[in-house]
Amino acid sequence: MTEVQKSMALFSGSVNPELAEEIAKDLNVSLGNVKLEKFANGEIYARYQESVRGADVFLVQSVCSGAGYDVNDALMELLIMVDAAKRASARSVSAVVAHYGYARQDRKAAPREPITAKLVADLMAASGVDNVITIDPVSYTHLR
């Protein structure tokens, strides 16, 4: 195991675990264990089942609908996972996002409209994301 592999921790959100498994296989690392729950009232819970202290944490989570989550739930799960990693003393947290929800809302087309893509980026930064890595999952599978 290389030094990079020792200091790296890779986790999957609920939306695209298959992609996370492919990335883990390609990097020759194991996916970390994180407990993710969605309560009956819609609230999301995340708890790392292993230490991430001092690790460079990579969270694979598409911000789109899938696996019983809508785009907003997927984003909230990512933010909660980031916050949990930061509070558990991760050295850095990178969001690996295969689909960046709200990316099309990147400019104002009319007065009094939000720039929601910027808001999502600001939310990720506020939660503690150090890096955002966007990938095209179709291209990713073709690169292999």
What is the predicted role of each segment?
Residues 35-71, 75, 79:
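Active-site-flanking structural segment that lines cofactor/substrate pockets
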Residues 98-100, 137-138:
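Short, ordered loop/turn segments at secondary-structure junctions
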Residues 141-144:
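Conserved small/polar residues in nucleotide/adenosyl-binding loops
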Residues 119-134:
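A glycine-rich helix N-cap at a beta->alpha junction
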Residues 7, 56, 91-93, 130-131:
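Residues at the starts of beta-strands that form the adenosine-phosphate
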